[in-house]
A protein has these predicted regions:
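Aromatic-lined ligand-binding clefts that engage carbohydrates, nucleic acids, or primary amines
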Residues: 115-140, 173
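An acidic-aromatic loop/edge-strand motif
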Residues: 23-106, 132, 151-156, 161-214
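Non-catalytic, beta-strand-enriched accessory regions in extracellular/secretory proteins
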Residues: 102-118
Length: 214
């Protein structure tokens, strides 16, 4: 088999097989089972990496205006850009690195994204993964969180920032961007040792996953 990363490709040239190569390959002999697991019983599992809750829906506010209703982040970004007279990211435009360092002479703006996080359990050691962290400030339950990058998640453009421990209940995470047309708010990710229950667009943090059923 072959492993492909994003945007990888493989070109194959096929040639007619010789008669000897066309013979069927005998199937391997059946070996003994390595382990036997009853499908009805829970199986202990250990996650290879932290679990994740996707933060793709947020209330949003441009320049401290009243909060808009919860919306998918890219759609919220389109709404704000349309009001500012900027090109929408859903349209065709140059990739961000093409305009890196370009001064468009825009007025200064802020764009705040508020996430309502509901947890059924106490959580410690959680992190927030986000893009453009150098333009962001973070608060959790009204208290400032140092935007100190301590690693990355999945892709090096997704910086991770440690969040404070929190108890079971409802919490508010607000990410405020120094907003300009070259800053591109994207989905964020809450990662840590917890489970996630999802129903439609609503998710809650639950007990960490320790067992699974087949």
């Amino acid at each position: 088999y072959n492993t492909f990363d994003a945007h990888d490709s493989l070109l194959l040239k096929l040639s007619p097989a010789c008669p000897a190569c066309a013979k069927p390959v005998p199937a391997p002999e059946k070996g003994a089972a390595l382990n036997e697991v009853r499908a009805a019983n829970p199986v202990a599992v250990k996650l290879a990496e932290p679990n994740v809750m996707v933060l793709d829906m947020a209330r949003y506010s441009l320049d401290n205006e009243p909060w808009h209703e919860r919306e998918e982040i890219l759609r919220a970004d389109d709404d704000v850009r349309a009001r500012l007279g900027w090109k929408l990211r859903s349209e065709h435009f140059a990739q961000p690195w093409v305009t890196a360092g370009v001064d468009f002479g825009d007025a200064k703006h802020t764009l705040a994204l508020a996430f309502d996080i509901v947890s059924r359990v106490a959580v410690s050691g959680a992190k927030l993964a986000l893009e453009d962290s150098e333009y962001a400030s973070i608060t959790f339950d009204g208290k400032a969180v140092p935007t100190e990058v301590d690693g990355w998640y999945v892709d090096k453009c997704l910086d991770t920032v440690a969040l404070p421990d929190f108890e079971a209940g409802a919490h508010e995470l607000i990410v405020t961007y120094d907003y300009r047309r070259t800053v591109n708010p994207e989905w964020m990710y809450l990662i840590g040792d917890f489970g996630v229950y999802s129903c439609g667009s609503h998710s809650e943090l639950t007990e960490p996953v320790r067992t699974l059923y087949y």
